[in-house]
Swiss-Prot record:
Protein name: Glucose-1-phosphate adenylyltransferase
Transmembrane intervals: none
Family: Belongs to the bacterial/plant glucose-1-phosphate adenylyltransferase family.
Record bears the keyword DNA damage: no
Family annotation (Gene3D superfamilies): Hexapeptide repeat proteins, Spore Coat Polysaccharide Biosynthesis Protein SpsA, Chain A
Keyword hit for ATP-binding: yes
Superkingdom of origin: Bacteria
Native source species: Bacillus thuringiensis (strain Al Hakam)
Catalytic activity: alpha-D-glucose 1-phosphate + ATP + H(+) = ADP-alpha-D-glucose + diphosphate
Cross-referenced CDD domains: ADP_Glucose_PP (cd02508), LbH_G1P_AT_C (cd04651)
Amino acid sequence: MAQKQKCVAMLLAGGKGSRLSALTKNLAKPAVPFGGKYRIIDFTLSNCANSGIETVGILTQYQPLELHNYIGIGNAWDLDRVSGGVTVLPPYAESSGVKWYTGTASAIYQNLNYLSQYEPDYVLILSGDHIYKMDYSKMLDYHIEKEADVSISVIEVPWDEASRFGIMNTNEEMEIVEFEEKPQFPRSNLASMGIYIFNWAILKEYLEMDARNPESSNDFGKDVLPLLLDEGKKLMAYPFEGYWKDVGTVKSLWEANMDLLRDETSLNLNDRDWRIYSVNPNEPPQYIAEKAKVEESLINEGCVIEGDVKHSVLFQGVTVEEGSMVIDSVVMPGAKIGKNVVIERAIVGSEMVIEDGTIIRPEKNVDDVVLIAEGK
């Protein structure tokens, strides 16, 4: 029996991320590069470390190899513990064969034995594909104070975007009275962030109940939460007011990177009190040539800049040759940009080679974002 834990986190990291197109052709969405030196999953894992959550199960499925290698034993996030720490939980084979995760609830259900060994009081369920900084310990305090069965973190979204999210309708005490999955005509703009705290006994009971239902899609939002409400359980909404971004599309991923370049951004990567940790390769210092120009940009180690870079994010090992211009763009690790190239409002994938004289920018709608990546 493992040492008892007050709270165990379960991080859902098996998503395909098909809306990110070629960026996730051979890569799980949580492993997609972000912010010049990070992966998307770094934010959730760093939140766990900074919040004092010491036991994290990471549930993987789609294209897991690079993600598994990246996570390792969790030492980058100080989660390499003798008791607890990080455990990667892919689908596994039973006597009846391999059982793939069929939904978010299915993924947790198939790992109830992992949770049981810690006898937790609470289980924190997280998504590995959002960009945000959050103190989960404050949410846990709120959950305990409200004597909730389940607490769900919510954020106000613009009304014209509310139909894209799972929406929580609450009373004045922030108790959830109704959950609507992507409603056509929303009555609230409180969107679920996909962050849940369950009392362990409640989670176990309702996941087992859901698994016995042949008509269930085994999803928290579509099946488990509505069932809890129908049976009169106490679900509380926990309001979050910081930066949070669902980077599930090419444009939203680009927007989140551009947010880092604002003079005043609520996503401060220089916050020494809430560091974002990552696994970084050893690279030499960046080199910026005499005639190069760099403005309002994040330039990581190992970059060689001989052209112009303006309001852009460049990951490690990127080369920008003489006469080239990179504007309002994200260039992922190891990309090589030749001479006299123009790149504007684009994401250039890892290890891409852009030939001399190439022009890359939106052709029809100036508000679009161009993706240049393998398989595109």
